Amino acid sequence: MLLLGLLLLLPLLAGARLLWNWWKLRSLHLPPLAPGFLHLLQPDLPIYLLGLTQKFGPIYRLHLGLQDVVVLNSKRTIEEAMVKKWADFAGRPEPLTYKLVSRNYPDLSLGDYSLLWKAHKKLTRSALLLGIRDSMEPVVEQLTQEFCERMRAQPGTPVAIEEEFSLLTCSIICYLTFGDKIKDDNLMPAYYKCIQEVLKTWSHWSIQIVDVIPFLRFFPNPGLRRLKQAIEKRDHIVEMQLRQHKESLVAGQWRDMMDYMLQGVAQPSMEEGSGQLLEGHVHMAAVDLLIGGTETTANTLSWAVVFLLHHPEIQQRLQEELDHELGPGASSSRVPYKDRARLPLLNATIAEVLRLRPVVPLALPHRTTRPSSISGYDIPEGTVIIPNLQGAHLDETVWERPHEFWPDRFLEPGKNSRALAFGCGARVCLGEPLARLELFVVLTRLLQAFTLLPSGDALPSLQPLPHCSVILKMQPFQVRLQPRGMGAHSPGQSQ
């Protein structure tokens, strides 16, 4: 009964807000408005938003609950906003759950743009690209090799590989952020469980609806209570690591990213007016790395497996490419990441998976920091902007046969520059270098060692789960990993 009342009240509130916005903005040339208030109920929101371009063009407004937002559905409009006019569009909105998850915004992913945010980004990027530059690839190689050995111990047995990939990517992030001592302390299962709990709770509809209909936070909400509890567990884990790192820190030396960042915040700020970075910024940088770097990469790896199960001819070509470069059965040989151009089809396959299933199909919302414009339309200050990255990747004016899995499109010079899988501009994903390294190493090792086979007669679905929040999750599936050289069928042969 309460839900019915809320659904009846929503159009009235939205209508009142619409009239107020119209009165304030009546003199501006705004993007066209897609009518309706229940767009969030669409099961596949990125594709639905792309479909609206047929009537309204690549940029339009719509109402998400009580919020008036502008949606960008093409590479041209996204790059105009996020690259050419990045300073106008670098802000973040401030919904309730962002405040909860980000500890009131000392955070890179969810924090608003400022000079302090810029200094925070610079420190975290340095920790990734300088602090662990020499250890990043060896750690990914070592943990991927251990993953393959675990899979080899159960040859041909159906495996829920999405969970295995999540454990692998979580291990990589934890090693690089906290150091290899976490393995001795047997903390990995606790870290993994905590991350899963935060992501699952945060993405639930009972949490998401509070961000678009803010007054609902005053009603009893068990989901919000669970989210707060999950965040407390998360913070306890990170604070424990901070304490241990501070106790053993040696000036001028660093073992991992947390060491590097702790020494960075101890230095006075070099940029005038930016303020001083604090331990809370190190805390939230670690959280961003853990949450942002676990499920996103694992999800992309899982989609790669699903696409290769549907396209065994591509899998066979990939294995032939690996055998040509490394020799058949050369499981201990490797292609260093700096020499990745030696495997053009593998790189093209990764690019195609990222095109069809971008890391985040709808980029986290941006907010205009001052009045601006896109494609000749006025965009007022404080407007929420949603870049539809998946929509841009399916734009028929840019991509030939956009809905088809066709890695060869990226073998043509210059095609890779058209993709926006990790975003662009000031808010581009900081973890992109690590994610690309992981995708390359894991898929290389996996296809060197195994042939991917369906677990039964039916192939896994290519349709994502409906009503996904941040990432496009696939339907649950299993795969058989048949060690190569054990008399398995070629992936190109019928079963």
From Swiss-Prot:
It comes from Homo sapiens. Changing residue 357 to W: In AH3; salt wasting form. This is Steroid 21-hydroxylase. Changing residue 340 to H: In AH3; non-classic form; 50% activity. The gene is CYP21A2. It is found in: Endoplasmic reticulum membrane; Microsome membrane. It is an enzyme of class 1 (oxidoreductase). Its EC number is 1.14.14.16. Changing residue 305 to M: In hyperandrogenism; due to 21-hydroxylase deficiency; non-classic type; residual activity of 46% for conversion of 17-hydroxyprogesterone and 26% for conversion of progesterone compared with the normal enzyme. 17alpha-hydroxyprogesterone binds at residue 234. One of its GO terms (cellular component) is endoplasmic reticulum membrane. A cytochrome P450 monooxygenase that plays a major role in adrenal steroidogenesis. Mechanistically, uses molecular oxygen inserting one oxygen atom into a substrate, and reducing the second into a water molecule, with two electrons provided by NADPH via cytochrome P450 reductase (CPR; NADPH-ferrihemoprotein reductase). It is a peripheral membrane protein. Changing residue 269 to T: In allele CYP21A2*5. Changing residue 303 to R: In AH3; loss of enzymatic activity toward 17-hydroxyprogesterone and progesterone. Changing residue 357 to P: In AH3; salt wasting form; 0.15% activity. Its main location: endoplasmic reticulum. Changing residue 17 to C: Decreased steroid 21-monooxygenase activity. Progesterone binds at residue 234. Changing residue 203 to G: Decreased steroid 21-monooxygenase activity.
